[in-house]
Regions:
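Active-site pocket-lining segments that scaffold enzyme catalytic pockets across diverse folds
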Residues: 103-113, 123, 131
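Structured loop/turn residues at beta-strand edges in well-structured enzyme cores
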Residues: 13, 43, 108, 167, ...
Length: 188
């Protein structure tokens, strides 16, 4: 169940039953379609597990979620975090190859850091050039670049890069979450 803008993309995957609605719809932004789908697939006494743990997100307004729960009752939405985590731990050979390809992109970009990071180069410029290197090495997109630099170490890695130029003795740290073919790498 997705907004209609994703129909073409989802049509290329292995899922054959893709249901869509015209979004955005301020009156019913897919909630009735999702409720109808769930009630058609899950028996009235059934439970629907969704991830509720770390790194999970509710991608709908909370009011819509509460409305969905009412519409699908007596079915219950329960915490399926453990089950989802167990499934995610198991990777096919194809997934492993995709993860390796994503990591290879980051590895190649890190190998290029000496091309653009050096004494006198502002940290903000290093960040931008690093993102460019990731894209040039094959990333489809760069979800984030974080890092820091400072004499003998760095103070934090969550502040935005600034225009302070790198100096001799600075330790530079870069962290990225580049994506290739839908697979992320987390590389420091």
């Amino acid at each position: 169940v997705i907004p209609s803008i994703g129909t073409e993309l989802m049509g290329r995957c292995w899922i054959s039953d893709v249901r869509t609605w015209n979004a955005p719809d301020p009156v019913d932004d897919g909630v009735s379609l999702l409720a109808d789908t769930l009630t058609g697939l899950v028996p009235a006494s059934g439970r629907i597990g969704i991830p509720m743990g770390l790194e999970s997100h509710l991608r709908m307004p909370v009011a819509d979620f509460h409305g969905l729960q009412k519409r699908i009752a007596p079915r219950q939405i329960v915490d399926g975090t453990d089950a989802v985590y167990r499934v995610r731990e198991i990777k096919s050979e194809a997934e492993i190859a995709k993860i390796r390809a994503s990591c290879a992109v980051a590895d190649a970009a890190f190998d290029r850091v000496p091309e653009f990071a050096g004494q006198g180069v502002p940290l903000a410029r290093v960040f931008r050039d690093f993102q460019v290197a990731l894209l040039q090495e094959g990333a489809d997109w760069v979800s984030y670049v974080a890092g820091g630099a400072g004499p003998g170490g760095y103070g934090d890695v969550i502040s935005p890069a600034d225009e302070r130029p790198l100096q001799t003795g600075d330790v530079l740290m870069l962290d990225t979450g580049a994506v290739r073919d839908g697979y992320f790498c987390d590389f420091d």
